[in-house]
C-alpha cells in the first residue's frame, strides 16, 4: 500500500468502483491508513446513492429490511467506531477479522459494540491477522470461529446465533442462494 503513489491508488480505486457500478456488483474495500479519503471517494463516486442501492434485492436482518443497502463491504475494517457508524448509516457492511480478539484492540471492540449485527461479517484475512489464541502463527480459515466467538461475547449473544447471523449476512451480501 505504500509502494505506489496515492494518485495511482485513487485512479484504480475509482475505476474499480465504476466497473462495479457498470456491472451492478458489490464493492469490497480494504482501506488501510486512508479512512477519510476512502469515504470521500465513495461519496464522490455516488456509491451510496438511492439509485445504486435500488439495484440489489432487499436484505432482511433481525430488525426487518435493512434501512439502506449499498452493497459496499469494508473488508478487515479497522477504522473508528464513529467511522463504522457513518458507513452503516450510508448502507455499508463491515467485516472484522482476528484483531478483534487482541487484548489491546479496543477500537475494533468498540466498533462491534456500536454496529448492529445485521451489518457485520466475520473473516480471517488468512494468512494474516491471526486471532488469539493462534496470534503470531499463519492464519487459517478455520480460525474464523475465534473471531465469531469474540463478536458473540461483545454482543452478549450465543456463538451459534452469531455464526448463523454473520453467515446469513455473507450469503445475502454476495447474493448466494
Which ranges hold each PLM region?
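Mid-to-C-terminal alpha-helical segments outside catalytic/metal-binding sites
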Residues: 19, 142-177
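Short acidic/histidine-rich active-site segments
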Residues: 118-140, 162
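Residues that scaffold the ATP/ADP-binding catalytic core of kinase and kinase-like folds
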Residues: 41, 131-132, 173
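Alpha-helix N-cap and loop-to-helix initiation/capping positions
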Residues: 1-12, 135-143
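Hydrophobic alpha-helical segments
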Residues: 44, 89, 109, 137-139, ...
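Catalytic pocket-lining loop regions of alpha/beta-barrel enzymes
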Residues: 5-121
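Ser/Thr-centric signal marking residues that sit
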Residues: 38, 101, 124, 147, ...
Amino acid at each position: 500500500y505504500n509502494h505506489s503513489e496515492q494518485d495511482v491508488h485513487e485512479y484504480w480505486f475509482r475505476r474499480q468502483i465504476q466497473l462495479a457500478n457498470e456491472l451492478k456488483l458489490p464493492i469490497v474495500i480494504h482501506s488501510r491508513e486512508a479512512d477519510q479519503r476512502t469515504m470521500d471517494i465513495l461519496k464522490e463516486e455516488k456509491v451510496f446513492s438511492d439509485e445504486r442501492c435500488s439495484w440489489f434485492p432487499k436484505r432482511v436482518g433481525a430488525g426487518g429490511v435493512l434501512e439502506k443497502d449499498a452493497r459496499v463491504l469494508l473488508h478487515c475494517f479497522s477504522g473508528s467506531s464513529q467511522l463504522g457508524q457513518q458507513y452503516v448509516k450510508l448502507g455499508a457492511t463491515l467485516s472484522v477479522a482476528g484483531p478483534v480478539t487482541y487484548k489491546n484492540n479496543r477500537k475494533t471492540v468498540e466498533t462491534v459494540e456500536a454496529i448492529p449485527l445485521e451489518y457485520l461479517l466475520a473473516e480471517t484475512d488468512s494468512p494474516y491477522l491471526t486471532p488469539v489464541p493462534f496470534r503470531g502463527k499463519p492464519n487459517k480459515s478455520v480460525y474464523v470461529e475465534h473471531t465469531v466467538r469474540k463478536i458473540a461475547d461483545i454482543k452478549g449473544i450465543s456463538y451459534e446465533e452469531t455464526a448463523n447471523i454473520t453467515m446469513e449476512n455473507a450469503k445475502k451480501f454476495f447474493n448466494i442462494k
